[in-house]
Amino acid sequence: MKALSKLKAEEGIWMTDVPEPEVGHNDLLIKIRKTAICGTDVHIYNWDDWSQKTIPVPMVVGHEYVGEVVGIGQEVKGFKIGDRVSGEGHITCGHCRNCRGGRTHLCRNTTGVGVNRPGCFAEYLVIPAFNAFKIPDNISDDLASIFDPFGNAVHTALSFDLVGEDVLVSGAGPIGVMAAAVAKHVGARHVVITDVNEYRLELARKMGVTRAVNVAKESLNDVMAELGMTEGFDVGLEMSGAPPAFRTMLDTMNHGGRIAMLGIPPSDMSIDWTKVIFKGLFIKGIYGREMFETWYKMAALIQSGLDLSPIITHRFSIDDFQKGFDAMRSGQSGKVILSWD
């Protein structure tokens, strides 16, 4: 079958032929319809330090997708041929304390689709049936294909009560923009997002944020004053991994504020811990999606009127995958969809 693979330990990704995957007793075989390019896929394309330490070569990559069930393992229940599904990209062990306690998103033995095992940039994908999620009929293939990153946004945004709160989102990448849209949709008062990429800030404006602030040109404190905010932000969603952005967040949080961190900062990032201590801040690390509470919330948010369509900016046939990666690497895109039909 046709697949996009990391074939060489260097920059790039290549179209190749690989054998169709075999279906185990507890697996589903999924015929892929659409995939989306993740920032992780760009890291793998660029062959950065993380990729060199993590990705086996050769490897079929990709983990954002929607497809149709075309094969079912003999032990599987609850699915049928023809079901439209996406799936959780974190494969968990099922036997550690967190898995047995129902906190599967915190499994210490997680493996990743398209990272540690073959991914979805292929005509067919096999995953454990446990990881598959049926897509409601009134959710499009395009939106279903970005449920993985949307889930990161939902998990981060809904970590804390947002109703009537003032929310700061640092980082206007696709996940940050979607998190800001979720916060506004569920009833936050002011949702302010910061970045230095004007293209992506404009996407955030299209998604309905209160203010999208280019911190290279505008002072966040001035924006807060303009909005009548006298005590700081109640909730911070750190999506950038940029040390200056996190330090600004600590400066502008209200006392007792709550921060959810999805962005991955450098390991040697230094901050003024007195601001965390004397403000009584609560900081929560976010990894992936809660299984499967986040998935049900994603579907419900879209069905209740949350419009994510502006975040999908580019669509290509899989044969034009290079154009898709070029768009993602340029920084002048939202989500990029590759069609396998």
From Swiss-Prot:
E.C. designation(s): 1.1.1.103
Active site: T40, H43
Catalytic activity: L-threonine + NAD(+) = (2S)-2-amino-3-oxobutanoate + NADH + H(+)
Main location: cytoplasm
Binding site for NAD(+): I175, D195, R200, L262, G263, I264, I286, Y287
Family: Belongs to the zinc-containing alcohol dehydrogenase family.
Protein's job: Catalyzes the NAD(+)-dependent oxidation of L-threonine to 2-amino-3-ketobutyrate.
Protein name: L-threonine 3-dehydrogenase
Organism: Salmonella typhimurium (strain LT2 / SGSC1412 / ATCC 700720)
Native organism taxonomy: Bacteria, Pseudomonadati, Pseudomonadota, Gammaproteobacteria, Enterobacterales
GN (gene name): tdh
